Amino acid sequence: MSESTVVRVDPSNERMLKAWNGDDGALWAKRAERFNDGVAAYRDTFFSAAGIQPGDRVLDVGCGAGQTTRDAARLATAGSALGVDLSGEMLGLARRLAGEEGVPNVSFEQVDAQVHAFPEAGFDVVISRHGSMFFGTPLAAFANLVRATRPGGRLVLLTWQPLRLNEWITTFRTIIAAGREVPSANLALSDPEETEALLTSAGYTDFRCTAVNKPMYFGQDVDDAADFVIEQHGGRLSDLDEATRAKAVAALRADLAEHQTDRGVFYGSAAWLVEARRP
C-alpha cells in the first residue's frame, strides 16, 4: 500500500491514523535508525521471550519501519513475518530495507490491527515492541489479536513503565516545559494489574509481566543528541519566546552533557516485558 491508500480504521483510532500517517510517521521514518538504536538494548530480552522458531508465522503489531519484523523473519527461516502499522511512510521504508537486506519471508500491510480481518488462528507468535500502546479501544484490539493467534500461540509485548520511572521522558518533558506546567500524561499498558485484567478479558491466559531496565541511546555526542531531542519536541519549543527557548535549549544541552559517556549519550529507561498465551 502507498501513503495515499485509504486505511479502514476504527473511529477510536482516527487520531492515531492522522498522526502516524502524517507528521509523526514522517519523523519516525526519517529517524528510524536512531529510534531503533535508542531501544537496541532491549532486543535480546525481547526476542528471547518471543522464542520464535524456524517454522513460526509471526505478526508484528505497530511495526514502524520494520526492524523487529525483519529480525523476526530471520528467526522464522521456514516461516514468515508480517508487520502492520498505520504509517504508510514507515512501511514504505520497511519494504525497501527488507529488499536491501535480502529478507524474503517478510511482508508489511498498512492496517488498523484493532479491526483488521487477520486470518483466524493465522499466527504462532504476536509481538510488539512499544507499538501496542496506541489503540483507541484496547479490549477490542487485543480480542482481535487473540482471534488471529493459534491456540497455544504466544503474545510478547514491550511497553513502558510509568513516566516517573523513565528518566528520559521526565527529563525532556520538564526541561522543554521551561517553567510551564508539564502536561499530564499516562502511558498505556504501564500498570501491570490493569494490563493483566485487559489481556485476560480479551481472552489470553498465562499472563506474565517482567520489569526490564535498560540504558536508552540518544546520540553519539551532545550536538547529535540535542538535534534528535529538539526535532521530536519542536512544537513545544516553538511556543516559547526566543530568550526562553534559548534557555531551554541550553538546559537541555547541559543535561545531555551530564549523560555523555564514551559510547554516546544515554538515559535510564524502564519497560515491561509482557507475555501471555491464547488458550
Regions found by a protein language model. Give the residues of each.
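Conserved class I S-adenosyl-L-methionine
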Residues: S2-P54, Q67-D71, M90-L93, E231
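A short acidic, Gly/Pro-enriched loop at the edge of an enzyme's catalytic core
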Residues: Q114-V125
